Amino acid sequence: MNHFINLLVAEGFVRTNEPLTDQLVVHSVAGSGKSTLIRKFLEEQPLARAYTHCRADPPNLEGRFIQPFKGPCPDHFNILDEYCKEPISAKFQVLIADPLQYRTQHLRPHYVNHKSHRLGPETCKLLSSLGIKVESHRRDRDVVTLSGIFGSPILGQAIALDRSASDLLRAHGIQALCPIESIGQEYPVVTVVSSEPLRNVRFKDQVYIALSRHTEQLHVLSPEFPHTTSRPQ
């Protein structure tokens, strides 16, 4: 456990005041590097095993990769990624997740990380304006444009925040993902479409997921932005 905690601290995770137990709970935002941290731990610890409820790694020759979910391996150090997605059914040494992606009740964490290496400052400003705390750890600036729902073309991967937006896109020959379908995915360019103002969307986890899938450019089409505004790189 000490080795894993040392990795957390080295990667910028911050200790909370929650008393430590024999099961470590770690929370972090999108792009914080938690998957990279898990992979590094697997490389350094032969008895470590990691499983996820989301997108697993492709197998490798060494057998050290994040595997699809199954029960913990006896006599090993077991990590469960995205534990919030399903009820916890077994004992893992580490539970780790981005709880902002889920509506389910989560445990109180021992370590947290609000800093994202993937999301740029403009994206984080937009998320902050919606009451979602994410800090950018990128040195370069990202591109975010805000337009009315008919104010800009669809660029990159489309994500629809509601049924009306999805139906509208489909009518124009565009097959959009819903936020849940995009969990664990990354795209260079994303266009998020909402038929209502982002502040009015009932489930904030859906907004957070949709606005955090891009690596380079985010384009938001919503009726609250009648005139296109651009925050260039």
From Swiss-Prot:
Note from the entry: TGBp1, TGBp2 and TGBp3 seem to act together for cell-to-cell propagation. TGBp1 is the main movement protein that physically cross the plasmodesma with the viral genome. TGBp2 and TGBp3 would facilitate TGBp1 function.
Places the protein is found: Host cytoplasm
PROSITE patterns per record: PSRV_HELICASE (PS51657)
Ion transport in keyword set: no
Domain (+)RNA virus helicase C-terminal per the UniProt entry, residue ranges: 134-233
GO MF terms held by the record: ATP binding; RNA binding
Example GO BP: symbiont-mediated suppression of host innate immune response
Natural source organism: Papaya mosaic potexvirus
Family from the record: Belongs to the Tymovirales TGBp1 protein family.
Keywords assigned by UniProt, alphabetized: Host cytoplasm, Host-virus interaction, Inhibition of host innate immune response by virus, RNA-binding, Suppressor of RNA silencing, Transport, Viral immunoevasion, Viral movement protein
A GO cellular component entry from the record: host cell cytoplasm
Keyword Oxidoreductase appears in the UniProt entry: no
Domain (+)RNA virus helicase ATP-binding: from-to ranges: 1-133
Identification of the protein by name: Movement and silencing protein TGBp1
Function: Transports viral genome to neighboring plant cells directly through plasmosdesmata, without any budding. The movement protein allows efficient cell to cell propagation, by bypassing the host cell wall barrier. Increases plasmodesma size exclusion limit. Acts as a suppressor of RNA-mediated gene silencing, also known as post-transcriptional gene silencing (PTGS), a mechanism of plant viral defense that limits the accumulation of viral RNAs.
Subunit structure: Homodimer and homooligomer. Interacts with capsid protein. Interacts with host AGO1; this interaction targets the host protein for degradation, thereby suppressing the antiviral RNA silencing.
Main location per the UniProt record: host cell
